[in-house]
Amino acid sequence: MAKGLVIVESPAKAKTIQKYLGAGYDVEASLGHIKDLPKRGLGVDVENDFATEYEVIPGKEKVVAQLRKLARTADAIYLAPDPDREGEAIAAHLAEELGSESDGGRSHKKQKKPVLRVTFNEITKKAVQEAFKHPREIDWNLVDAQQTRRILDRLVGFQVSPLLWDKVRRGLSAGRVQTVALRLIVEREREIQRFEKREYWTLDARLHAAKPPVFDARFVGLNGEKREINNEEESQQILRDLAGAAWTVAAVKKAERKRNPTPPFTTSKFQQDASRKLGMSVKRAMMVAQRLYEGVELGTEGTVGLITYMRTDSVRVGADALTEVRELIGRDYGSGFLPSEPNVYKTKAQNAQEAHEAIRPSSVLRTPEQVAHYLQDDELKVYKLIWQRFVASQMMPAVFDQTTVDIDATAKANAKYNFRVTGSVLKFEGFLKVYEESKDAKDDEDESLKHKLPPLEAGQSLKLEELKPEQHFTEPPPRFNEASLVKELEERGIGRPSTYAAIISTIVDRGYVQKTAGRGGKFHPTEIGFVVTELLVENLKDIFDFEFTARMEEDLDQVEEGKIKWTDALHEFYGKFEQDLEYAGKHMENIKRMEKATDQKCERCGSPLVLKWGKHGSFFACSTFDKKDPNSCTFTKENPINLTDLGDAEISSNNEEEFCENCGKPMVLKRGRFGTFMACTGYPECKTTRRLDSVQKKPDVPLDEKCPDCGRNLLLRNGRFGEFVSCSGYPECKYIKQNLIGLKCPKCGTGEIVEKKARRGNFFYGCNQYPKCDFTAPFKPVALTCPECESAYLMEKVTKDGTFLICPNSRTPGRGKKAKAEEKPAKKTAAKKSAKSKKAAAVEAVPAPVLVEPGSCSYTKKIAEPQVEAAETVA
């Protein structure tokens, strides 16, 4: 019997939706995007109106083949990726691959069976079933907006990154939004470095009234005019003038102040509060929210989507959800906390789709306490945050009684020194009973001036207990943390909240910034971050301009609304980009060849030192060094690092000079492959080093995937060789997920070839049956037979001259004694013979590799021209 084929992005989402749709549908997962611009090559024809060359993403061929197979027997195809630009693009690519032919997939007239788009903002039975009653066509304005963003990012990534490779260092990347975000951090650091602190003083008077409590009032002016205390001399003069002064209440102002609840979460507000309140990175918070949206097992209820879609700019709330939350407030908190009408909020974002809702619980009746047993710790924290914010948004305002008291101290010659104190008392909790929005430190500056006050009246005399002068210094603007960076990006209109997690991860992973340890860790630009930012901003002024980047974001919104053509937006961008790119190619400084004169002398020969650039940053070298002259001076030394660049890194217990614990010589800061560290100046005689824990270790991220060995959840972890996936049950369970490339081992025939990382950081390929099978290859094996020596496989080697297929039996770089050894047949023990006989049937189906003397085959074939594979950022 034919069924409807439903395609979503993830297996977790598929599992939840399958339960709601029943046996009449097959729900399958595409595992995210199935098509993209080619990994190598630009993939965009800028001369032909930005025509694109999309291809199936390598590794997704089996997924696409399986979906095609299922589509052939389905009576209808329902495309149900997420309700946003990315989801619409996934749906469009699925439609193209599953048989829609006319207009590049933009209509389905030649498709014999209906191909329909289905969207829902929450994964609940009611929402899903209702969505399937009202399917629609693909929204090509949304697809065009996504494609425009993708092309913009590809153009910048592929054409600017090579400039950095050529002028600074290979492996660096530039991104249309990534670089602008980095610019914010770098410019803030420059602002901090330029900041000159200014001295100022405060003066508080501790006073008694007829009744307690004692309170403090602060000096604000003289004879009714505002005045500041600039130094200690002025402070002491005021203290002398106030000796014997009469203290009187000049005025008392009382007012009732209301504090309104905040709207339910948008994506950016959620990211900020998760960072401030929960100490979560933006990336982690979004991953946890994704799991809550796609579905969590709730015992007998089965899999349930607990929150609405978490990528939204809207604060709208549906009528059913409003009815439900008002019912809960009246029942659990009382009618006094329930407004007569629902609170209505206006969306600030210009292009927020009102079809979307704010982030809220799918059912507010599922309280955090009721679901706590089924959630992981971070899931519960995020769910509770969203639940509390939503409930509070529909409650009454909090009410405060605020009293402001002006006090005069009448001194000699009737000079009146003015003091002020503000008292604030919570009269009615309102929404604060459930939730209070987190604030930046600067938002709380005035809180210290609010006190509980005794009964006071104008004309009342007061008694002075003491005067408390205190010295202060103005402070520079604070460095960005994740929450404040997200806030700044949103306020400037740079990027979209859904991309902020990727942007932040990229600038950290590329080594452009470091993040100090602990909750609310601050971003500090590294030396390479400063260099890259200054080069790009100086030479590509338009492209990495704040206003231009924000304007391009507005253009993308207009493409989505159908107000402008996507190609027009690209032409506007590319006109400026092409000019800037040409200018940068001619005028960008080549840091690799930099030799800046300094006033320092060589410690070996006395010649002047010059500042040069190496793979680990800048360093000093003797100006007489000559590569061609083996007798020239080779003296070099580290460029001392400004300690402020390391922020909160612990240099030593008192930030004074540190000495080696082994030899007593001074320790200095150095840079290496893995970052900044302390090293003894007695090197090479003394090799003492000490790590700096200035960078926060990335937290383990739970994945929606089970361990095949023990059934526990898998975790995305970070080790010394990069990210890897392993079991959360470690050390009891030592399962590590291997990176299969989809090829059987050509040596043993039973194992799979996996990509591995060596201690030195380079990749190689080996059999996953190691140590039973010791097959390895220095380059990626390909399931092709060598036409010359009939080797069972070839290898794909990428060089600066292009991509080549080479025979493993040819003498190639990286294949020395070890490579020869791997080709030798192993000696058979009795146990191995026995094992082999048991697997004979399985092995017969796999052709045995043809083993010939290494170096005896010369087969090589060029299959691709050299391409710059820039490390672009999807912004």
How does the language model describe each region?
Residues 252, 261-274, 301-309, 476-488:
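Short acidic, hydrophobic short linear motifs in intrinsically disordered regions
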Residues 2-5, 16, 161, 194, ...:
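Basic, low-complexity terminal or inter-domain segments flanking catalytic cores
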Residues 228-263, 460:
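Metal- or metallocofactor-binding catalytic centers and their adjacent structured scaffolds
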Residues 1-150, 220-221, 229, 236, ...:
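Intrinsically disordered, low-complexity regulatory segments
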